[in-house]
Structures are given as C-alpha cells and as structure tokens.
Amino acid sequence: ILFVARVLNWNDKYLPSQTQYTDEYDFESSCCLSRARYDYIYKCKVDNERYRTNGATYRWCRAGRKASKYIKKHVQEIKIPVLLCQAGKDTLVSNTAEDEFIAKLPQGTKKVYPDSKHEIFNADDDTLEKFYSDILDFWA
C-alpha cells in the first residue's frame, strides 16, 4: 500500500484513521493516564499551534519503515548503553518489536511500566516517579 501511495503521490495524505489536528477533547482514548496532565497539554495545544500534532501521513509511515529496517540491519553496531522505556498498554508501538530490538543490544536495558499508555511522561504520579527514577539511575 505504501508503494501505491507513493505512485499516486499521496505523500502528505493521512493514513486511514489519521487526521490533522482538531481541538476535540478526548482524554479517554488519548495516550495519557493523568487527566491533569492531559488537561494541561490540551490547553497548551488549543492556545498555541506550535504544540499541535497531526496524524501520520504516508510519507511519515514510509520514513518510519525505512528507519526500522535500517536499525534492524545495523543493530549490532550500537555500542552505547540504551535504555528502553516500554509502556505496557501502548497501542501505537509494538512491544514485541521493542523486545526483539533490546534483546539484540549488548548494553540494552528495558524498563516496563505495565499500566502506562504510550505517553509514559503523562502517566499517573506513581508511574512517573518510577519512570524518572529509572532514567536518572540509568545515567548515574
């Protein structure tokens, strides 16, 4: 489908179920666990267009696939410590693919936040405290 989209010059068209930014309030289906943090970011997005994000386009998807293929091919060349923070309830990123990636790294460390959605940095206070502690401990 990405090839067809390229031939038809759909580079900037949104993928199915993806759209440009709207100011629709939808905490329940967001990638955020903390309503307070969601509300804060929501207000920032409404008030300032620089905070706004759009859905994925065919161009974005092609670039992501290209980057993923490159990383898979060159994973053994990564010689630095890598911390992978994995959201247990992520619906945007494949935890299986992340597991395969981190397992191939000689200095790979994985931390899982089982109750978190994609935006771990917008999780509940307990998860966020562990998340930041894990990051600081990793670099200590």
Model regions: which residues?
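Alpha/beta-hydrolase-fold enzymes
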Residues: I1-R52
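Glycine-/small-residue-rich active-site loops that bind phosphorylated ligands and cofactors
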Residues: R52, D90, T127
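Active-site nucleophile elbow and catalytic-triad environment of alpha/beta-hydrolase enzymes
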Residues: R52-H74
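Short beta-strand/loop motif that positions the catalytic acidic residue
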Residues: I78, L84-Q86, D90
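Short alpha-helix in the alpha/beta-hydrolase fold that links the catalytic acid
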Residues: I80, S94-A103
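Short glycine/threonine-rich loop-to-helix capping motif typified by GTGT followed
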Residues: V93-S94, D125
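Catalytic active-site module of serine/aspartate enzymes centered on a nucleophile-bearing elbow/loop
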Residues: G108-A140
